Swiss-Prot record:
It comes from the Bacteria. Its EC number is 1.1.1.270, 1.1.1.417. This is Sterol demethylase protein B. GO terms for cellular component: cytoplasm. The keyword Lipid biosynthesis applies. It comes from Methylococcus capsulatus (strain ATCC 33009 / NCIMB 11132 / Bath). Participates in the biosynthesis of bacterial sterols. It catalyses: a 3beta-hydroxy-4alpha-methylsteroid-4beta-carboxylate + NAD(+) = a 4alpha-methyl-3-oxosteroid + CO2 + NADH; a 3beta-hydroxy-4alpha-methylsteroid-4beta-carboxylate + NADP(+) = a 4alpha-methyl-3-oxosteroid + CO2 + NADPH; 4beta-carboxy-4alpha-methyl-5alpha-cholesta-8,24-dien-3beta-ol + NAD(+) = 3-dehydro-4alpha-methylzymosterol + CO2 + NADH; 4beta-carboxy-4alpha-methyl-5alpha-cholesta-8,24-dien-3beta-ol + NADP(+) = 3-dehydro-4alpha-methylzymosterol + CO2 + NADPH.
Length: 328
């Protein structure tokens, strides 16, 4: 039985591939030719080269596949990436799901995002809270929300697919690194001079991998499962990083409203004069940190059997891995 993993060189994909190999599964990785494949070095993984924007390469990669984990996505808060976000996250996912159904793939797990989950003003959001593509938000959030509609449409047409919605993932094997990984490295190297107070859900990588595997085995077709970890304040995370890295945390807290005002001025200037620069933040990211958004993973615990682990331990795992790689 062959299991195909898209996004196998990414943070989640690298961890998921290792978990699948540990279970004795035959793994095929769907990767772009220009991708850095360090995450797969030394692993007994078949490589299928292609692109989510190329239907023919998708079709070839799915040949003989019984299980599919779709973890690939383009993640960016840069305005200049709007078209690529749509092409990869929406059109690419649509073609992959269509071809998976036509190829007779038995089971699919689609990795969406907590960004595609709506805000519950009364408390924690569960699987029933959705995001409209017309709401204020990042283009990434919009594309992940729209792509879920395509996934559910294919489920209606007969594809046995389940959706997983992780929050901000923390953990090892972060080769690129991820946004959370870059934040850890910035902290460890003293590049973080100040911070914006706020809070968000941070989830251990081991929990996300567990839900991916459990969703494949037990998930209901066309349904979502949240895995959102702990709701952590930025101050709490900075304290953990100070303890884990030995580097003092920044003490200067910039008021969120002030940073939102700065972002309203910065974002259009960046869009106009530096369209290819990757911003550290924008208006919507600051807004999200102070939106009160939090997730409810009780369905994953109740129906799939998830046993949540410590988010602080996940940060410790990430720091230890970066140290082993000589990056800290």
């Amino acid at each position: 039985m062959t299991t195909l993993v898209t996004g196998a060189t990414g943070h989640l994909g690298a961890n998921l591939v290792r978990a699948l190999l540990a279970r004795g599964e035959k793994v095929r990785a769907f990767i772009r030719r220009q991708s850095d494949v360090a995450a797969l070095d030394g692993l007994a993984v078949e490589r299928a080269y292609g692109d989510l924007r190329d239907r023919r390469s998708i079709r070839d990669a799915l040949e003989g596949v019984e299980r599919l984990y779709h973890t690939a996505a383009f993640v960016s808060i840069r305005d200049g990436d709007r078209q690529e976000l749509f092409d990869v996250n929406v059109v690419g996912t649509r073609m992959l799901m269509q071809e998976a159904r036509r190829a007779g793939v038995r089971r699919v797990v689609h990795t969406s995002s907590f960004g595609a989950v709506g805000i519950n003003p009364q408390g924690a959001s569960n699987e029933h809270w959705t995001v409209s593509p017309f709401e204020p938000g990042t283009d990434y959030e919009r594309t992940k929300a729209v792509s879920e509609h395509d996934v559910i449409l294919e489920a209606v047409r007969g594809l046995d697919v389940t959706i997983v919605n992780p929050a901000a993932i923390v953990g090892p094997w972060d080769f690129r690194p991820s946004l959370v990984g870059r934040t850890i490295l910035d902290f460890a190297h003293g590049r973080m001079r100040a911070f914006v107070p706020g809070a968000f859900d941070f989830v251990p990588m081991r929990d996300v991998v567990a839900v991916e595997l459990l969703a494949m085995d037990k998930g209901i077709r066309g349904e979502r499962y949240l895995v959102t970890g702990e709701h952590c304040t930025i101050g709490q995370i900075l304290q953990w990083l100070e303890e884990l890295t030995g580097h003092p945390r920044p003490r200067l807290a910039i008021p969120p409203r002030l940073m939102q005002g700065i972002a309203l001025l910065k974002d259009p200037l960046e869009r106009r004069f530096f369209p290819r620069r990757t911003p550290r933040f924008n208006y919507h990211s600051i807004r999200l940190l102070n939106s009160g958004k939090r997730g409810d993973s009780s369905r994953s615990r109740r129906e799939l059997g998830l046993v949540p682990t410590s988010t602080r331990a996940a940060f410790a795992d990430a720091v230890a891995w970066f140290r082993e790689r000589g990056m800290i």
